[in-house]
Amino acid sequence: MGKRLLDKLWERHVVTTNENGLDLLYIDLHLVHEVTSPQAFEGLRLTNRKVRRPDLTFATMDHNIPTKDVWNITDRIAKQQLDTLRANCKQFQVPLADIGDEEQGIVHVIGPELGLTQPGKTIVCGDSHTATHGAFGALAFGIGTSEVEHVLATQTLWQRKPKAMGIELKGKLQKGVYAKDIILHLLSKYGVAVGTGYVMEFYGETIGAMEMEERMTLCNMAIEGGAKAGIIAPDEKTFVYVKGRKYAPRDYETFEKKWFELYTDADAIYDLHISIDVTDLAPYVTWGTNPSMGVRIDEKLPEKHDVNDERAFSYMGLIPGQSTYDIPVQHVFIGSCTNSRLSDLEIAASVVKGRKVKEGVRALVVPGSKRVRDAAIQKGLHHIFEEAGFEWREPGCSMCLGMNPDQVPEGEHCASTSNRNFEGRQGKGARTHLVSPAMAAAAALYGHFVDTRKESYDGAISYS
């Protein structure tokens, strides 16, 4: 019987197996940020250990950074975490993309753009959305702080092998529909626990047509379906993306030959299989307090089915049967490790070019990294956004989570390109609606959600 992509990635990294069936995996890349690393480094100090492979470790600052004035850090805890990471990286000789450095940015944005992320690697980070890197055919997953310490000290991690889920995507997306809508559709149909105990492998003609940055969006949110990771077999688009980047292999051709072996064999069998035809897929909007609580833009909000729905409707200030077009939007956030790359900003800019943000709407664009910001500026995207009435910010996690000054006031609604809409995620009492960059940009213009399939980008729109 053939092997799945998961099998090939896993078997290449098993050092040994213990009596309980746990495998000791070798870790090829350890990404670090300021929030989940302080206790791990302190653990090394207390046991007089060193970082085993600083050359396979890379740190950045992202969660706590103010995006309006990056040097004006007024929160005491945020400043302490940033200062601590800086000191730890210096002591343990770990490479750091510090505030102001050209390589700084959100950890799951800079990994791929610097060429640190490569097919066939095992990649971990003390962050839920490490699955992003799986878009390159890497086995990438989030870990806890105690595991961060274990990897720093040993460059290995004890893990139980997950099962493999195959998700086949068929058909061609309509204009105005994106990878973000695919993953929100998947979650709304199958729930936030469908992937528990699995690694999701996305494949099919739809994947083949996607560029790398859309594939990253898909894998980024695999964790929202409960999956250990999300992976996509590398192809020519993957190889072209990686080649020539700063940390890409120097003997590239040798690595590329090995990467071509990373695919699921034709006679391999998944433990669970799902097939989705995206041809008639519509833009999605989440209405509730987890990513599975979403509907098509042309659907009404659902009826209440249980106490969770009851609580979600109450928290969000919405009612069953309400039209998605009638949901008010006071804030728009285009950013996060899900949708802050150059192609995301280009899509949003194409929506708002020559138009104005609705009066009363606060709209932010936060590039995912310094390199994304610089590339966007070279293309003049910052002018398009600023002329439309958006705030153009510096790179960071920003409004994705309430750990920095970028927050949504209590009781107000935000159209967000991020990945989580939990209660209080964007600030106390904040009401988050997850959407694609195009949907978020259009909501900024109208002060409510509209159908980006019908949005002509010249001011005309149809709601029917």
From Swiss-Prot:
The keyword Coiled coil does not apply. PROSITE patterns: ACONITASE_1, ACONITASE_2. Its cofactor is [4Fe-4S] cluster. Pathway: Amino-acid biosynthesis; L-leucine biosynthesis; L-leucine from 3-methyl-2-oxobutanoate: step 2/4. [4Fe-4S] cluster binds at C337, C397, C400. GO terms for molecular function: 3-isopropylmalate dehydratase activity; 4 iron, 4 sulfur cluster binding; metal ion binding. Heterodimer of LeuC and LeuD. Catalyzes the isomerization between 2-isopropylmalate and 3-isopropylmalate, via the formation of 2-isopropylmaleate. This is 3-isopropylmalate dehydratase large subunit. It comes from Bacillus thuringiensis subsp. konkukian (strain 97-27).
